[in-house]
Design a protein with these regions (language model features):
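Generic structural signal for well-ordered, non-transmembrane alpha-helical segments
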Residues: 6, 13-16, 20, 44, ...
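Short, hydrophobic, well-ordered secondary-structure elements
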Residues: 38-59
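Short, solvent-exposed segments of well-ordered alpha helices
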Residues: 2, 6, 33-41, 113-120, ...
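Charged alpha-helical initiation segments
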Residues: 1-40
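Flexible secondary-structure boundary motifs
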Residues: 64-138
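Charged/polar positions within long, soluble alpha-helices
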Residues: 20, 24, 54-62, 106, ...
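Charge-rich, solvent-exposed alpha-helical interaction surfaces
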Residues: 11, 18-21, 73, 93, ...
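Amphipathic, Lys/Arg-enriched alpha-helical patches that create a basic surface
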Residues: 116, 120-128, 139-163
Length: 163
């Protein structure tokens, strides 16, 4: 199911294009560590886009009742409690809207399913970079592209649940 939100869709297309360009560039480089650094950068970028996209979907849902005070409260609560998205944090925020929303999400994405494993990998890579630095990068652009393609259904499902 394609993403209906134009802003999110455009960001996902940008990432896909960036991955294509990076793979072409990396193929011309003699030092594989350059590709690993680039892959790690793209991984962190993907996580940022995921955070922003998921928050945007929650904000859009928060404004549906047309009550700015309620929406502002919800948006601040989401911003405060939601970064480095994980299965449980997404489920908890969905549950605040409606327990059925989190149940639908948890039913679709079991703890060890491919999509959640990809999301966890993206988070782990970013955390390792932030806390251990770039001294031991072994990430490939193909790995990042694989993770990216596997997390898109998470955004699609959140958009579907909140619609």
């Amino acid at each position: 199911m394609p993403i209906r939100n134009a802003e999110i869709s455009a960001k996902l297309v940008d990432i896909a294009d960036l991955l294509k360009d990076a793979k072409v560039w990396a193929a011309t480089q003699p030092d594989p560590s350059l590709a690993a650094h680039l892959a790690t950068y793209i991984d962190v970028y993907i996580l940022g886009v995921l955070e922003e996209s998921i928050e945007l979907l929650f904000r859009e849902r928060a404004y549906l009742p047309k009550d700015d005070c309620v929406a502002n409260y919800i948006c601040k609560d989401i911003k405060r409690s939601f970064s480095n998205p994980k299965r449980t944090s997404i489920g908890e925020v969905l549950k605040k809207f409606n327990p059925d929303f989190s149940n639908a999400f948890y039913t679709k994405f079991a703890p060890n399913c491919s999509e959640i494993e990809a999301l966890d990998s993206i988070n782990t890579i970013k955390q390792n970079l932030a806390h251990m630095g770039a001294y031991d990068l072994k990430l490939s652009l193909q790995d990042v592209e694989d993770y990216f393609n596997r997390v898109i259904p998470i955004i699609e499902e959140i958009e579907s649940i909140l619609s």
